Amino acid sequence: MVADASQQGQSNGAAFNQQQQYQQQQQRQLFGGEEEFGDEEELGDDVDLVVGDYSAAFAGEAGAEVDEAQAAALAAAHAQAQQQAQAAALAAVPDQIRKYVVLFNQAVQINNVQDISNAYEGTWNRLTDKFYARSEWPEAETIAPLVNDDQKFLTLYRELWYRHVYSRLSPDGEDRFHSYDNYCDFFNFVLNSDGPVQLELPAQWLWDIIDEFIYQFQSFSQWRNKVSNKSEDEIALLQDGGVWSSYSVLNVLYSLIQKSRITEQLVAASKGEDPDEVAGEFGSKPLYRMLGYFSIIGLLRVHVLLGDYTLALKMLDHIELNKKSGLINRVTACHVTAYYYVGFAYLMLRRYPDCIKSFTHILVFIMRLRQYHTRSYQYDQINKTADRMYALLSMACALCPTRLDENIQTQMRDKYGDQFSKMTRPGAEGLAAFEELFIYACPKFITANSPAYHDEEALVEYKQKAVFPDPTQHQLRVFLSDVKTQLSNANVRSFLRLYTTLGTDKLASFLEIDEEELVEMMMVMKNSTRSLKWSSGSLLHGQVVNTSDLDFVIDTDMVHIAESRVGRRYGDWFLRNGTRMHDVLNNIQAKPLPIVSKQVQDEAAAAAAEAKDAKDKKVKNAWAAGVKAGPPAFSQRSGGAGRSSVNKSAPAPAGAWGSSKPQPSVTA
């Protein structure tokens, strides 16, 4: 009986081991084998439900019952094996990486912002290029013994770890879900504490956290909508719609704004009051103040991605973009991002003058920045954004002819000169140029609603669609609807440019249409060339202006035309280039003279002495030849008939041959 019981226990243990191995294999496929950490409350309760549901399903498949003693023994053995595996993995980590992690953790613990900034912006990228350019960094569980399992640092480390996976590698479904869990842990740590957390991070890192959080939300939304290449495990994960949902992302950003009271601080600053008086306990801390401020810019971006351009601009009611001393200028990437999305929102709202002004301002800033900012790890990303803004600027200028800065005009012509010339012509060629630049330069739009992964029948029906809904194509159609209206009026403009006054009957005969149809066409044309232009106040405020270089008024049956051509400012051109030449000369004069070695100096001196000797010798030989030839013929005396006919009373020749007073030379 004892032997039978022992054999039965061994068979049960083997079955349980097989069950555990199968369960771990499935979890690695679904979640990457990472364990949940921390007991903080999650922003979305559904995050923890995924693991629990699948664990229950796996246990049900095995159907094995194990008593508590055996389960405890197996758990202890599993923990020991896991510790041994982690120790082996830690031993494989290079010494330079381990030292970096220890020093990085020490800087975070003592809130040394300067050391954190150096470790984050400089050392991390250098070590990545050296050790992990095409592979993952060590997992947080591997380096946990080096930092005494400090969850605060491990959460920050995981944020960098997943960002590296997104930027250098290709994230899979489990990476996307685990990254969301980690962001939930971080934001719960910041938002749900009884008081301000004892953590200080550089402004650049805080902006990157918000920026990366929105980027991963955007990436997940696009990945989620591609239902054709999803496995069954990924579909099971995606049935939980709370992960990376629009509601959860917006909830985080609005919560950070509310917690930091950044809106109240900005209002107080605009009135000349002290922002610290209204900041409160949390808003007075740099961590909360900067996270709240960057969340405003983040909401601008999210609302543009969702296609709500009016609400996007509404988010910046209390931010002065043109203020040089504002918080927006502390981080270059934040500054560029804000202007990019503001300019694009203006473009989609048909406010072309404001769009051109926004893009011109930030492109001039980037142009001046390039000579100082090449060391930044974000330099390439800023340049890519600048190229996209040049494309959007060329579209806005094609729809609203405007005088631009000479440097911006030159750059835009060099990059998109061919497309710009096409966009000014009506027809399919012009529309194709607009479409090409829009697809290239627009943001990666997302949809708030996901496919029905929870409904199998609806999902099958969704997969059978020939064309899946694409938010980018939808926004393109919205934009091109206005472009088509403006391009269709090109024929009317060509006739109006030839006259200052023209009868409607005559113009209708030119176009071969009725007068009523002509008046309707001209009213559509006039409306399409009217737009708001910001002058002060909120970004949504503005005055109605004409966006075309041609304007007209219809008085009964007569059309009065006024054309305003964009002229070139020659005075500004000369002033700008004169100042540039002056700066170049000052720069050249300020540079030190080149240091020449002693050997080169000696060689140059010897060559100069040799050249001087040769020159002196040549002069001496010429002098000797002149003396040997004798005096000039006109100074020689000869008797008789052969005597010279030179006038004796004439003055003697100058120089050594005659008077000491210099005289004009005479031909010998």
Swiss-Prot record:
Gene Ontology biological process terms, A to Z: formation of cytoplasmic translation initiation complex; translational initiation
GO MF annotations, alphabetized: translation initiation factor activity
Intrachain disulfide bonds: none
Principal location: cytoplasm
Cell compartments where the protein resides: Cytoplasm
Bias type Polar residues, positions: 1-17
Biased composition (Low complexity): 18-32, 648-662
Domain PCI residue range list: 358-552
Any single GO CC term annotated in Swiss-Prot or TrEMBL for this entry: eukaryotic translation initiation factor 3 complex
InterPro entries cross-referenced by the UniProt entry: eIF3l, PCI_dom
The entry's keywords: Cytoplasm, Initiation factor, Protein biosynthesis
Acidic residues composition bias: residue spans: 33-42
Domain of life the protein comes from: Eukaryota
Stretches for region Disordered: 1-42, 625-668
Function: Component of the eukaryotic translation initiation factor 3 (eIF-3) complex, which is involved in protein synthesis of a specialized repertoire of mRNAs and, together with other initiation factors, stimulates binding of mRNA and methionyl-tRNAi to the 40S ribosome. The eIF-3 complex specifically targets and initiates translation of a subset of mRNAs involved in cell proliferation.
Family indicated by similarity: Belongs to the eIF-3 subunit L family.
HAMAP family referenced in this protein's UniProt entry, alphabetically: eIF3l
PANTHER family: EUKARYOTIC TRANSLATION INITIATION FACTOR 3 (PTHR13242), EUKARYOTIC TRANSLATION INITIATION FACTOR 3 SUBUNIT L (PTHR13242:SF0)
Oligomer status and interactors: Component of the eukaryotic translation initiation factor 3 (eIF-3) complex.
Protein name: Eukaryotic translation initiation factor 3 subunit L
Originating organism: Mycosarcoma maydis
